[in-house]
Amino acid sequence: MHYTTLGHSGIKISRLCLGGMSFGEASPGFHQWTIGPRETRAVIERALEHGINFIDTANSYSFGTSEEYIGDALRSLSVAREDVVLASKVHFNEGGLSAAAIKREIEGTLKRLGTDYLDLYIIHRFDYDTPMEETVKALDDLVRAGKVRALGASAMYAYQLHNLQDIARENGWTEFTSMQCHYNLLYREDEREMIPVCRQFDMAITPYSPLASGHLCRPTWESASTRGTTDKTMVNKYDRDRTIDMPIVERVAKVAEEHGVPMSQVALAWHWARGIEAPIVGCSKPERVDDAVAALDLELSDAEIDFLEELYQPHALVGPKGRPGEKELAGTTNVKLTR
């Protein structure tokens, strides 16, 4: 396993993060494709065997049962607390990112994970209903209380992250050290502003959906899997751009064939070639962990990276929330992204 540092926090993380959205109690109308406690334990055990020490989840994943399954698995495997970097998120709950909600939700998360502190606490989205100062101060209080080691953010506009960092700096509060953004070969909009802002603040990039919800894992668009047929969020995120994205999928398949590896390994290797610290991979089987880890040994040439990126076209923004009552910001019309 290869390791790096979580931004300016000094926390050592594996170059792969195990995502917890695949874990938890399946529920109709939400995540019907998640796996149970026994399967969760098997996936986590395999990840740990490979040296993956970074696990991400959220209070909203499967209504908290993702956190429960992860906590149960780590206890049953007798994993020392200092050997894992646990991250969870807050926002999709009553009260959003208000001080009261943050204070309440961290206690629930810690209880479900079976720990007395989090290594990384991430705000899942930007909260328009709560003053930024209130949110940042509440998060800083958790750090000072020893309940959280570092802070992260996810899926927002770059100007919002910049404002949050400015508030933290001006008040001497804890700054954010990581950004969990939507980033893959089919969606590269954050190269325009978010990623440069993160580099300015010495933040780690830990993208979600590095495999575009499976679209970068197979040469065809459709999937007969439970997730492929029930996940409306995935459909809304990618299907509207199928026409412009499918040629990129075909190029991933071509590069994978030339290397004799699964397409997923090419898609992941591209992230590291781009300087990304730790893409988050969701795995429903131990073998999927094996495939992801093998991608660390795949090196793409500059010519291959250019080949994979050449056909990218601008996309509507996916992830950040627009201000309530206002039309969401559109994507850019600048076609060419350069390395």
Task: Annotate each PLM feature.
Residues 1-2, 200, 224-254, 258, ...:
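Terminal-tail/helix-coil boundary detector
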Residues 1-84, 144, 335, 339:
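N-terminal binding-site loop/beta-alpha segment at the start of enzyme catalytic domains
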Residues 6, 18, 40, 55, ...:
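Conserved, mostly hydrophobic/aromatic
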Residues 22, 59-61, 90-94, 124-127, ...:
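Active-site-proximal loop/turn and secondary-structure-junction residues that shape catalytic pockets
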Residues 27, 93-193, 200, 204:
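Glycine/proline-rich, positively charged
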Residues 44, 67, 71-74, 106-110, ...:
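Generic structural signal for well-ordered alpha-helices
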Residues 190-227, 262:
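Aromatic-lined glycan-binding groove of carbohydrate-active enzymes
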